[in-house]
A protein has these predicted regions:
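N-terminal binding-site loop/beta-alpha segment at the start of enzyme catalytic domains
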Residues: 1-82
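Structural preference for beta-strand elements that scaffold enzyme active sites
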Residues: 13-17, 49-50, 80-84, 126-129, ...
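Conserved small/polar residues in nucleotide/adenosyl-binding loops
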Residues: 184-193
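Active-site groove signature of glycoside hydrolases
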Residues: 119-136
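Distinct, well-ordered alpha-helical segments
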Residues: 63-74, 96, 123, 138-149, ...
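Active-site beta-loop-alpha junctions enriched in small/polar residues
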Residues: 21, 56, 86-90, 132-135, ...
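Short, acidic/polar
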Residues: 31-43, 107-120, 168-170
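Surface-exposed, active-site-proximal loop segments in enzymatic domains
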Residues: 91-105
Length: 194
């Protein structure tokens, strides 16, 4: 396995990471937990160090299933791996039954609650990389970045990133608290990217 350092952060990750969304969200029924636990152990043995999840990767009955799965399966390897998870989307449970739509929520109080939930579910005392999953048009980037600076100072988050944001948003947030990663969806088979 090859490894990379993300930007100037010093955060070293495997060149290939394991995105975990499909294990319990979006692509049919959740995968078998025992099989996924074995897969995680195999991935670590192969040199994978970067594992990506989000607080909203789950099912209607267990909306945080993916983080719980990672927390259980990767606990024995915690000192060897980098865990990335995401905040900024919440389930709109105003209807009585799911599937529940996701709505952006990056208010500081929501971020603080989200980080505590992710830490508990992932069975860790810190998050290596914490992404803003989607931009909340009701919250200024400086307010989000200020909250991240606070969480970094507390040691709960080591690095942070932003997913699917425009240049102006990234620049404004970065001025307040330096961003390690800008997460963009690219597909290897596409030859042209905007």
């Amino acid at each position: 396995m090859e490894y990379r350092v993300l930007g100037l952060s010093g955060l070293r990750v495997s060149a290939i990471g394991l995105g975990c969304m499909g294990m319990s969200h979006a692509y049919g029924a959740p995968a078998d937990r025992k099989e996924m636990t074995e897969l995680f152990a195999l991935a670590v043995d192969m040199g994978y160090t970067f594992f990506d999840t989000a607080e909203v990767y789950g099912t209607n009955t267990n909306p945080h299933d993916n983080e719980e799965l990672l927390g259980d399966a990767l606990k024995p390897f915690r000192d060897k791996i980098v865990i990335a998870t995401k905040f900024g989307l919440t389930f709109d449970k105003s209807s009585e039954c799911g599937p529940y739509p996701l709505i952006p929520n990056s208010k500081p109080k929501s971020i603080r609650l989200a980080v505590e939930g992710s830490l508990a579910r992932l069975k860790t005392d810190h998050l290596d990389l914490y992404y803003q999953h989607r931009i909340d048009p009701q919250v200024e980037p400086e307010e989000v970045a200020d909250t991240m600076a606070y969480l970094i100072k507390e040691g709960k988050v080591l690095h942070w990133g932003i997913s699917e944001a425009g240049e102006d948003y990234i620049r404004r947030a970065h001025k307040v608290c330096p961003i390690t990663v800008s997460y963009t969806h690219l597909r290897a088979h596409e030859t042209r990217h905007d």
